[in-house]
Amino acid sequence: MNQYIMKQLASEVATGNNQLPAEYLLVLQPHEALWNEIKFIKEKFATDFDCAMARIGLPHITLVRFKQYQAAEVRIRQALRNSIKTLQPFKIEMKDFGSFPSHTIYINIVSKVQIVNTVKVVRQGQRFMKMDKDNKPHFITEPHLTIARKLLPWQYEKGWLEYSHKDFHGRFIADHALLLKRRQGEKYRPVEKFVFQNEKEEEIVQGDLFNL
């Protein structure tokens, strides 16, 4: 096993957290100016429709979410490094708003194909993301950027009445993915940034991955 993985595992054992589960998100984030613009939209929605959830969630496009024991995190991150480095940067274009009746309002993603293809690459490490039969990774099939979710009926009805007529347009270059982690009772925090390097894909088998 290589020295990097050994150090990570030793650190987790020392803190006593590696046997506890955590929630993870792998996301794409807009550049700072667009991020701030979308954050303002979310803040306004939260104020106008008394929706604290819109204020809490930060702007991102989810690729996969999963729950897993923290002992598996080093292996998950190594698998993501190996798969994501094969990707090349691509443009994401967003236009206007959409909804999942009757609970979520989001920004439409126009350029979905490359995001879906990115998810396919990320799936290469799914065996490390499955905690048990009741906790399997959820890979996104309909990319979107959430403004507000878990809406009450009145929040959705009034919110969608307004946002279905609003205009929005934004674009950014996706050149990395960000892994976020949340332990019980905590907020999500970044744990690693995976840069799209357009490197030649290597055949990865479990023994090679861990240098066993």
What are these regions (language model features)?
Residues 175-184:
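Short beta-strand segments and strand-loop junctions that repeat across beta-rich extracellular domains
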Residues 1-91, 112-173, 188-212:
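Basic, often amphipathic N-terminal segments
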Residues 25, 104, 176:
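Short hydrophobic/aromatic beta-strand or adjacent loop that forms the aromatic wall/cage
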Residues 98-104:
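Short, basic/glycine-rich phosphate-binding loops at helix/coil junctions
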Residues 105-111:
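Short histidine-centered catalytic/ligand-binding loop motif
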Residues 102, 184-185:
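Short strand-connecting beta-turns/loops that link adjacent beta-strands
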